[in-house]
UniProtKB/Swiss-Prot annotation:
GO terms for cellular component: actin cytoskeleton; dynactin complex. Disulfide bonds: none annotated. It comes from the Eukaryota. May be involved in protein-linked oligosaccharide phosphorylation since the deletion reduces the negative charge of the cell surface. One of its GO terms (biological process) is actin filament-based movement. This is Protein LDB18. The gene is LDB18. The lineage of its organism: Eukaryota, Fungi, Dikarya, Ascomycota, Saccharomycotina.
């Protein structure tokens, strides 16, 4: 069932994005206005993903600083390190995506106002990059969420282990003090 819920959540998100992107569309509006709106939405999406990744890195750093002594098991440290490396890779990819986005915006904004109608076909090659940028941003956000889920599952497992050990120690303590 969790897979079905994930699919339903992704379908809901896709429908929501389609409504958001399509909400500003009007057959009478200028293409450059529509592109500006798409640029702004992509930029907001990028910064939301970037903030999400930064918060996740802070969580990882805090966890590493506070709980590394309690973890102890080499497998747990490897899992944590792999999550941290993945998040750092995504964080770097977000920076690369932003630089590509800014370059695309500069090229498109400077050229859209100055192109003649007969040259418009040449400039549309730049516009074809926009869906790829949106897809890359969505993929990175989904990967961040998947890594966060791995981290949370692992953290729950480790916490469960330590709670079990604490319960055993308390039971032993009761037995010792009762005798």
């Amino acid at each position: 069932m969790p897979g079905l819920k994930l699919v339903e959540a992704l379908e809901y998100r896709c429908d929501r994005l389609e409504r958001l992107i399509g909400a500003g569309y009007s057959a009478n509006s200028d293409v450059s206005v529509q592109l500006d709106e798409l640029y702004n939405q992509l930029h907001r999406l990028y910064f939301q993903g970037l903030k999400y990744s930064q918060d996740l890195l802070q969580l990882f750093n805090t966890f590493m600083a506070e709980d590394i002594e309690n973890v102890g098991a080499p497998d747990d440290i490897c899992i944590f390190a792999s999550c941290f490396d993945d998040i750092y890779t995504l964080y770097s990819a977000f920076d690369e995506l932003n630089s590509q986005y800014m370059e695309f915006c500069q090229i498109s904004k400077s050229s859209l106002d100055q192109i003649s109608f007969k040259d418009a076909n040449i400039e549309t090659k730049q516009l074809k990059k926009l869906p790829e940028l949106v897809d890359n941003c969505n993929i990175m956000i989904l990967r961040s969420i998947a890594i966060l889920n791995r981290f949370i599952d692992w953290n729950i497992e480790v916490n469960g282990f330590f709670q079990f050990q604490k319960k055993r120690l308390l039971n032993l303590q009761k037995v010792i003090y009762s005798t």
